[in-house]
Amino acid sequence: ILLSSLATGSIGDAFAELNQFEDAYDYYVKASKSDNNYTTPLFLYKAGTVAMRLSKFKKAEEYFTSIKLDYPKSPEAKNIDAFISKAIASNQ
């Protein structure tokens, strides 16, 4: 499952490099569904940042909040409050 989510997330990375953000978003969301402490917060973070770029601010807030609540010890949680605040502010 770990390798599968990494492969799926890597496809998302490739789409992001090509500025195909809708496709990247879809792959990051798929990759984030793998329930493990390593890849899930990473791909929730990537899904959130791409969601912000696509003006999906409520979804971004959900992804960032999930990192805060479910993966508080992950590297992605370190400054997540700033991302949550930015998503909330952008949605208003």
Per-range role (PLM):
Residues 1-4, 31-40, 68-80:
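Short solvent-exposed coil/turn linkers within tandem alpha-helical repeat scaffolds
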